[in-house]
Amino acid sequence: MSENSTIVSNTANLVKFLNLDQKGSILAEYIWIDGANGVRSKTKTLFKKPSSVEDLPEWNFDGSSTGQAPGEDSDIYLRPVAIFPDPFRMGDNILVLAECWNADGSPNKFNHRHECAKIMEAHKDQKPWFGLEQEYTLFDLYGNPYGWPKGGFPGPQGPYYCGVGTGKVYCRDIVEAHYKACLFAGIKISGINAEVLPSQWEFQVGPCVGIEMGDHLWISRYLLHRVAEEFGVKISFHPKPIPGDWNGSGLHTNVSTQAMRDEGGMKAIEEAIQKLSTRHAEHIAVYGDDNTLRLTGRHETGNIDAFSYGVADRGSSIRIPRSCAKEGKGYFEDRRPASNACPYQITGIMMETICGGI
């Protein structure tokens, strides 16, 4: 990995300091979503281990430096909403997911969690389960797909998906490290696999209930960026990272309610798909930036201008797994969301469409 990435953290030198006694202090890494749909974080020292988010103090940051506020009124407030164990500092140290709020007490315009949480609470009796398949691509420091020949291209797609062996997969060490970091942090990560495009991988998170889906997906993204730092590698969630005859990256969204999982649930699945067909444009609007480059009707995608569904059809907007069609119950997969989409917006509009607004 050193050939492609020359700037790597001196982790071995850091370890002896990580093992120093903190004298009872707790390091809390506050994490939030910025104005460019990325993650930011900063650290606060606590003098008592919190037992819940209610024990954590509200904090603030300069929103003019994150695209979330103008310079003349730049204070944005961080309200903790979830706690996770910290896999980097370990011990009693924690990761804190926080929502962003304006000084006037209103949610920041990039705080999509707030509205999502309200609709999840309104429809909690439906017992919604979600599972997200996060695809991403790894690049070196200079913007080249990791492991690709300098100034050239690897062989055509085919051997890379779930590949094994040198020349078929790249950066497995980063992927494995991220997997373990997620497990340590309590993320409901359910699997990993190499993807169709060389240097592209996927991890799955879920099933998660309601708002938990967005929380776990965002923290897993944060962990991926942090792990990649250690290796001097960049993570891209762009839905079409390489132009041409190469697969894009998606955030396939698996959805079910209790009615869909019960006997005869196929009727509820079909009713949900019918509702989704009437709001295709509204969903596409929040399903990620640059998705037009990915949803072309090629490379295992449907066309962005047309809604479609089918059993086991990866070229459709909505796929019903063959096993679910056979059993007459289960879940469906929305294949439209781009890899850079916000999970709160995806799951929020999904519940609004299939269960009703509030």
UniProtKB/Swiss-Prot annotation:
Give every GS beta-grasp domain span.
26-105
Name the major location.
cytoplasm
InterPro entries in UniProt: Gln_synt_N, Gln_synt_N_sf, Gln_synth/guanido_kin_cat_dom, Gln_synth_cat_dom, Gln_synth_gly_rich_site, Gln_synth_N_conserv_site, Glutamine_Synthetase
Catalytic function, reaction form: L-glutamate + NH4(+) + ATP = L-glutamine + ADP + phosphate + H(+)
Q: Which UniProt keywords apply?
A: ATP-binding, Cytoplasm, Ligase, Nucleotide-binding
Q: Which residues form the signal peptide?
A: none
Give the location in the cell: Cytoplasm
Enzyme's top EC category: ligase
Q: Name the Pfam families on file.
A: Gln-synt_C (PF00120), Gln-synt_N (PF03951)
Q: Write the Enzyme Commission number(s) for this entry.
A: 6.3.1.2
GO annotations of cellular component type = cytoplasm
GS catalytic domain location? 112-358
Single annotated GO MF: ATP binding
Which GO BP terms sit in this record?
Answer: glutamine biosynthetic process
Q: Which PANTHER family match?
A: GLUTAMINE SYNTHETASE, GLUTAMINE SYNTHETASE 2 CYTOPLASMIC
Q: How does it assemble?
A: Homooctamer.
UniProt lists the family membership as follows: Belongs to the glutamine synthetase family.
Q: What is this protein called?
A: Glutamine synthetase
Q: Which organism is it from?
A: Tuber borchii (White truffle)
